């Protein structure tokens, strides 16, 4: 080691540059939070009871580094999840999936799986209201697409390509984002799927 005047070493003069890491796994968390906040708003005003479904997980191994702490080190999905949210609105069962993309012209169909499409079909067959919320983060636009149009496109596309934005705009509804509720999707359901009036 080279000694410098006043016993400074060379390492004292080197600035450490911290590399920023991007967590791609949490890319959709902002949109999810917007939906959760919207659902909390609806619940607090007695408009609807809609919650995010828990993901079914089987815990296999747990470590206990301290008595008061437990750390899950191995877990598996018990079964394929269906859709993200479900609940009740004005006596109607509501069931929907939420997807986000940075693409500007289409929504990747690889985001949808056969078991989800089948589940949506089953909900519709029972008279439930089923749809997808599609958020284009680059455009700052969110659409509500009724499940029949997603199912129809999925059957043609076989889940392989992407759903064009113009298809979504033709068959879906643009949701005007708000401060609270952030994603007022119940207004779309009320006006266009139930033929009623807005909640606001």
Swiss-Prot record:
GO cellular component annotations, sorted alphabetically? cytoplasm
UniProt cross-references to CDD domains, sorted A to Z: RecU-like (cd22354)
**Keyword annotations of the record:** Cytoplasm, DNA damage, DNA recombination, DNA repair, Endonuclease, Hydrolase, Magnesium, Metal-binding, Nuclease
**What cofactor does this chain's UniProt record say it requires?**
Mg(2+)
Q: Which GO terms describe its biological process?
A: chromosome segregation; DNA recombination; DNA repair
The positions making up the signal sequence are none
Which Pfam families has this protein been placed in? RecU
According to UniProt, residues marked as the site described as Transition state stabilizer are: 99
Q: Where in the cell is it found?
A: Cytoplasm
**Predominant location category:** cytoplasm
The entry's free-text remark on the cofactor is: Binds 1 Mg(2+) ion per subunit.
Q: What class of enzyme is it?
A: hydrolase
GO terms of molecular function: endonuclease activity; magnesium ion binding; nucleic acid binding
The entry marks the following residues as binding Mg(2+), namely: 82, 84, 97, 116
Its annotated function is as follows:
Endonuclease that resolves Holliday junction intermediates in genetic recombination. Cleaves mobile four-strand junctions by introducing symmetrical nicks in paired strands. Promotes annealing of linear ssDNA with homologous dsDNA. Required for DNA repair, homologous recombination and chromosome segregation.
Give the family, as the similarity comment puts it. Answer: Belongs to the RecU family.
What's the protein called, per UniProt? Holliday junction resolvase RecU
Q: Which organism is it from?
A: Streptococcus gordonii (strain Challis / ATCC 35105 / BCRC 15272 / CH1 / DL1 / V288)
């Amino acid at each position: 080691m080279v000694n410098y005047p006043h016993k400074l070493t060379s390492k004292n003069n080197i600035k450490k540059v911290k590399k920023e890491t991007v967590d791609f796994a949490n890319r959709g968390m902002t949109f999810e939070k917007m939906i959760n906040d919207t659902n909390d708003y609806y619940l607090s005003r007695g408009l609807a009871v809609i919650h995010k479904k828990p993901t079914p997980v089987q815990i296999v191994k747990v470590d206990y580094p301290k008595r008061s702490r437990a750390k899950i080190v191995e877990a598996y999905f018990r079964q394929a999840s269906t859709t993200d949210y479900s609940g009740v609105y004005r006596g109607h069962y509501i069931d929907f999936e939420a997807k986000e993309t940075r693409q500007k012209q289409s929504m990747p169909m690889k985001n949808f799986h056969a078991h989800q499409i089948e589940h949506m079909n089953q909900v519709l067959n029972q008279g439930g209201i089923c749809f997808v919320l599609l958020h284009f983060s680059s455009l700052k636009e969110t659409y509500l697409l009724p499940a029949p149009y997603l199912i129809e496109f999925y059957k043609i596309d076989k889940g392989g390509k992407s759903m064009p934005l113009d298809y979504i705009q033709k068959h879906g509804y643009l949701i005007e984002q708000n401060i609270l509720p952030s994603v007022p999707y119940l207004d779309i359901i009320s006006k266009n799927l139930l033929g009623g009036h807005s909640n606001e």
